[in-house]
Amino acid sequence: MIVEPKFRGFICTTSHPIGCKKNVENQIEYVKENGKIEGAKRVLVLGASTGYGLASAIVASEACDAEVLGVSFEREAKGKRTASAGWYNIESLKKFVEGEGKKFISVNGDAFSNEVKSEVIDLIKENMGKVDLVIYSLAAPKRKDPVSGEVYSSCLKTVGAPFTSKTLDFHTGEIQNITINPATEEEIEGTRKVMGGEDWMLWIEALKEANVLENGVKTIAYSYIGPEVTYPIYREGTIGRAKNDLEKTAGEITKVLKSLNGEGYISVNKALVTQASSAIPIVSLYISILYKVMKEKGTHEGCIEQIYRMFKELYEGNLNLDSENRIRIDDLEMAEDVQKAIEEIWPQITSENVFELSDAEDFKKEFFKLFGFGLEGVDYSEDVDITTV
């Protein structure tokens, strides 16, 4: 069938298999051009199908020549409904890696569940022995507590007071004012349960108990801080509370891994166009301005550039750590000259000048690329088989 983008709000409900494959190939090409990294050899990536998790799986496999086990929860094609972009991404990467004669194991299931943890541990024992790097990059709207069975939902709200600011509807290019209401205590706790560090710790404890962690193992979870203009909705909001919990967990994990000389890290990454960030009010406008400023300065990076740099710094003993022991790969975003330029543009921006003062057009293009649309070298008028890549 011919696949075109279809939308429900900020969610694209279709994905293009050949476009997703091309997107993965472009990232692989970047890694190959930039050379090998002497690092991890057996890697578990939790949340391996999109964004930073996908980039981590690609860098591990292609730069480090590591064996990779990737866990994700994606939708296969059914009837005339395409598979999710993440499903095509993982299939594309798996085919490519196996074509090179390397090992890539994929598990499609709920990483929050005990069942998937057990399945992954068995697969590590059978195929890899032990892992020396665990990447935690899960993003989900809900999580079922494996002990109590209670289902928790995450939400995107402020804490304490409502917050009004401007945001970008990137479909129309309109700048609108938006008010975000504060969360209840229950919503704050629900978001922490889904997006905090609890499940990361459960994974590390389960892997350690099963004796599948290598001596000197490292584990990294991804976070974001950003500038003050986004604080009320992000860092000081429900998501920020969950990220604080995630960051606190890194230190606790280092203690758990002490007997293995292991370490738990948080990597604070750059703001990028992802399925998650495009739905966050205010952040979409901030990213559009950020892209323009960083491109003009020649410092713009996407997921793959960020993660390649992080791996290189990690394994060459050159980590840029802050006072709280977090890896700062957001250093170029948070550079004083970049933030100053954004602060000057922010109050001036309107629906009339948004395309001149920001990279709103590119935000839209990058968003479409997440689902395999708008990539060079893909004929979108062709019939495609939606069940494979």
UniProtKB/Swiss-Prot annotation:
Annotated GO molecular function terms are: enoyl-[acyl-carrier-protein] reductase (NADH) activity; NAD binding; trans-2-enoyl-CoA reductase (NADH) activity
What family is reported? Belongs to the TER reductase family.
Which Pfam family, any one of them, does this sequence belong to?
Eno-Rase_NADH_b
Keyword field contains ATP-binding: no
Q: Report the catalytic activity.
A: a 2,3-saturated acyl-CoA + NAD(+) = a (2E)-enoyl-CoA + NADH + H(+)
- Report which gene this protein is encoded by: fabV
Question: Which UniProt keywords are given for this protein, alphabetically ordered?
Answer: Fatty acid biosynthesis, Fatty acid metabolism, Lipid biosynthesis, Lipid metabolism, NAD, Oxidoreductase
> What protein am I looking at?
Trans-2-enoyl-CoA reductase [NADH]
Query: At what residues does the UniProt record annotate the site feature described as Plays an important role in discriminating NADH against NADPH?
Result: E74
Q: Which InterPro entries does the protein's record reference?
A: Eno_Rdtase_FAD-bd_dom (IPR024906), Enoyl-CoA_Rdtase_cat_dom (IPR024910), FabV-like_NADH_b (IPR050048), NAD(P)-bd_dom_sf (IPR036291), Trans-2-enoyl-CoA_reductase (IPR010758)
Database matches in NCBIfam families: EnoyACPredFabV, PRK13656.1
Q: Where is the active site?
A: Y234
Q: Which residues form the signal peptide?
A: none
